């Protein structure tokens, strides 16, 4: 086990438990106060990691910035931004296409009803998730949307008392950002997040970076390392960000401090979370989890590859933890909550 003599016994015990898990060898974590003081550092916090679903936090920040500047609202119909061929047929319920009623807010909060292109709910389907666990492959946004159209909408957009977690939502938000700004997703991340915050180890993984894949912290499925550069580049606004633990926490602090979008959004994006059968409770753009023994909660994003990052809604303490092992969204969130409860 990695030696960290300055960490508390509780933190040492926490990381020891992570390292004893099958397939986990070098977990990484970084925690900082809202002011930037390091509260916990474990492993190499400068090593680049594939953030997976934590990318959605970055996408959220850029969408909220578009709302701040008046280009969008949460009530803006997606059909007002994207062309009909993007939208048509994405949420058909009872034979009626409700896709034109999907709003920006519905996409952010997973209340669009659109099926998850990556891991649709039907059994006996050879999903993209199953495929990339066996061998690498790529896909386009258009192909992902076509997969989603094969499945009925989970509900009429905005009407259900629960959410339907769907990676398709954030692929669409990436397309919305490209349309509303006239910039590619990777260029926008550089302009709106990387440059203002001075992040040195953060970038969007595209086909231009295939040769960098082996520089990333390895992710394992059981005992098998995943080699999926094509898939990683295909995730786009839903999962293609590369960053280090330290850079990710710097991003979260920027979000908390209002450097990326108006700070008043924190209350909106963490209010009234709704349950999900396949993910932790979701609000507008973040997963919500209570912190044991406190009256506050955690606004976070996570990925089944064992990575999660979030903000203590009350104190602004920001954290990221990664085990680099394929598991579940809920499992990654539990690891983050357990870490935040200690610090």
Please annotate each region the language model reported:
Residues 24-26, 69, 73-75, 160:
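Short secondary-structure junction motifs
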């Amino acid at each position: 086990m990695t030696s960290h003599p300055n960490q508390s016994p509780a933190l040492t015990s926490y990381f020891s438990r992570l390292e004893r898990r099958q397939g986990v060898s070098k977990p990484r974590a970084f925690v900082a106060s809202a002011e930037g003081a390091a509260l916990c550092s474990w492993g190499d916090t400068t090593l680049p990691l594939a953030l997976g679903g934590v990318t959605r936090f970055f996408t959220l920040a850029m969408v909220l910035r578009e709302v701040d500047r008046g280009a969008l609202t949460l009530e803006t119909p997606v059909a007002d931004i994207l062309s009909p061929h993007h939208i048509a047929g994405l949420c058909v319920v009872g034979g009626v296409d409700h896709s034109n009623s999907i709003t920006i807010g519905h996409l952010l909060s997973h209340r669009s009803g659109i099926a998850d292109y990556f891991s649709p709910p039907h059994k006996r389907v050879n999903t993209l998730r199953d495929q990339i666990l066996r061998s690498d492959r790529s896909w386009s946004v258009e192909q992902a949307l076509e997969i989603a159209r094969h499945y009925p909408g989970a509900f009429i957009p905005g009407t259900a008392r629960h959410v339907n977690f769907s990676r398709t939502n954030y692929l669409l938000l990436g397309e919305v950002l490209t349309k509303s700004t006239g910039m590619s997703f990777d260029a926008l991340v550089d302009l709106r997040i990387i440059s203002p915050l001075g992040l040195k180890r953060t970038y969007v993984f595209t086909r231009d970076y295939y040769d960098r894949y082996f520089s990333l912290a390895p992710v394992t499925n059981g005992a098998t390392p995943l080699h999926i550069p094509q898939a990683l580049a295909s995730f786009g606004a839903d999962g293609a960000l590369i960053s280090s633990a330290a850079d990710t926490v710097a991003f979260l602090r920027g979000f908390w401090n209002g450097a990326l979008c108006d700070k008043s959004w924190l209350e909106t994006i963490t209010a009234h979370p709704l349950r999900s059968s396949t993910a932790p409770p979701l609000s507008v753009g973040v997963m919500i989890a209570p912190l044991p023994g406190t009256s506050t909660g955690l606004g976070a994003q996570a990925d089944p590859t064992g990575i999660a990052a979030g903000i203590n809604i009350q104190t602004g303490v920001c954290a990221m933890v990664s085990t680099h092992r394929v598991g579940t969204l809920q499992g990654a969130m539990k690891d983050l909550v357990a870490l935040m409860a200690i610090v």
